[in-house]
Amino acid sequence: MSRIEQVAPYIATKKTNYRFVVLALIFIVYAINYADRTNIGAVLPFIIDEFHINNFEAGAIASMFFLGYALSQIPAGFFIAKKGIRGMVALSIFGFSAFTWLMGTATSVLGLKFIRLGLGLTEGPCPVGLASTINNWFPPKEKATATGVYIAATMFAPILVPPLAVWIAMTWGWRWVFFSFAIPGLVIAVLWYLLVRTRPSESPFVSKGELETITAGQATPDARRENIVISPGFSRLDRLIRVRDLSPISTVKGLFTSKNILGDCVAYFMMVSVLYGLLTWIPLYLVKEKGFTFMSMGLVASMPCIGGFIGAIFGGYVSDKWLGRRRKPTMMFTAISTVLMMVIMLNIPQSTVAVCVGLFFVGLCLNIGWPAFTAYGMAVADSKTYPIAASIINSGGNLGGFVSPMLAGYL
């Protein structure tokens, strides 16, 4: 008898909160996922110098990741909808960790491009699986908050990555950045497979009481699509965001023809374009155009992510608690405020403090609505079709990550 089987009867007799252990694992997995994809930005200056390439070619190396990432999303969504989350996510973590290691072995620009493509292909299933895990493991009243923690991982990793990657590159060489970053994922892949199941009802660590908490309030075919808290105080806001009484989508055709899913996908494309344009090129821009040293660049380049970390958690909480599970308001706020902040950044004074403050608020504004882009689909689709809905949104959205680094490099 395994250790898990021995402790399961004891766990089942007491009220558990194991979903938060799962959420902690989701945070760690996605932080590693993002660290492995964004470390390229910190080492691009070293790669440009070694391979004697221009900015457009450097942007193409970074962009190849997103081509693979977008291509693998929808197939992963179908697989997860049919076979479940557990094995696919573990395999994805192992795969992208292996390709991260291979980045350090590349001897040509072409090799770097193909490995980045492979990194994208293997990372693609991960966010679909993680978002589906949140959808399965959390009640509606906690989904945006949990999604905020999940999205915050995307900002937590880049806070640490630039200074850490630059230090490793300057101490041992840029290749050791990839060797070092590959190791944690190999460990987490095993832990995920051992500790997480597709649904809480399958887990030996979840009590009956917690299972009842998770299933309380979940959408039914007759439920209001956006699963919101109805209150007279929200009547004007509901008219503005056009709340409708529609049942969750239960067919693949319905997902691909849904204006809500496709609209979310297009909006996500725009936001991802901004995010990865920043993450890829801010380090090089600060060194080449603003005259920052490599070490000071690492700190300043982390500012959008510090703001983003706070914004993601705060935005998810606001959507769940203050806005009665309405997702569109924070999405709209993010779109408008990010545009305003980008205009401000074009005219920011030539001051380290001003640049740091400006980049902090860019990250904050960009990420307040970020959890809503993921959580919105949880109410539009039912639990069985949500992995496919998530893959459509992520696939289309992350094409922005393919376009923006190359376009920014060209400009």
Give the label of every model feature segment.
Residues 52, 84, 105-111, 122, ...:
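Helix-breaking motifs and short loop linkers at transmembrane-helix boundaries and internal kinks
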